[in-house]
A protein has these predicted regions:
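Positively charged, low-complexity terminal tracts
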Residues: 1-183
């Protein structure tokens, strides 16, 4: 939408987030959520006309347990105002494909195995983030999200995902791929 030479952008966050809670009595549990955001914008083409563009963004957020709330439920760092303990990874199409290959039994682990690191690796000017998603024989999946700020220490969040939770995750990620391509 042109408005005096400026384009307007709209961002739609899906109302529902997929969440897994893995609290522990000793307070060392964790939780995860997957969020979808759809960014719609208009950009000028080489011919001078304005064209709509759409970007579907997926984020995996893992948060450590921070204790218990006043009502006795587990609390997690993502509910704190200045959360610095949660780890967030923006999932690209390749990342989604690797997780789906693991959930479908085609691979034991998402991303590369062996070498300097295993799993999915993202790096930018602020540091790096890794996601390890591995099938555990007869027990479900192990998840580890970690970030290392440039010049800082590694911060990690890890928990398990049951086979049932994995099936729901598979359906949601397949739906995300369809959303990306509008199929």
């Amino acid at each position: 939408m042109q408005n005096g030479g400026l384009t307007s952008m709209s961002v739609t966050r899906k109302q529902e987030q997929w969440r897994i809670y893995k609290p522990r009595k000793d307070g060392s549990g964790a939780a995860s959520r997957i969020e979808m955001k759809i960014v719609s914008d208009e950009k000028p083409g080489k011919d001078g006309k304005t064209y709509p563009v759409r970007d579907v963004q997926m984020f995996w957020v893992a948060s450590p347990q921070t204790g218990y709330s006043d009502n006795g439920n587990a609390s997690f760092s993502w509910s704190q105002a200045n959360d610095s303990k949660s780890v967030t990874l923006k999932l690209g199409e390749h990342d989604i494909g690797e997780i789906l290959a693991t959930l479908s039994g085609l691979k034991v682990e998402a991303g590369q195995t062996g070498g300097k690191y295993s799993g999915l690796f993202h790096q930018n000017s602020r540091g790096s983030t890794t996601l390890q998603f591995k099938r555990m024989e007869g027990q479900g999946y192990a998840l580890r999200l970690a970030r290392k700020p440039k010049g800082g220490n590694v911060q990690e969040v890890k928990h398990t995902i049951s086979f049932g939770e994995g099936e729901v995750l598979r359906v949601l990620l397949e739906s995300a791929v369809r959303q990306i391509y509008r199929w």
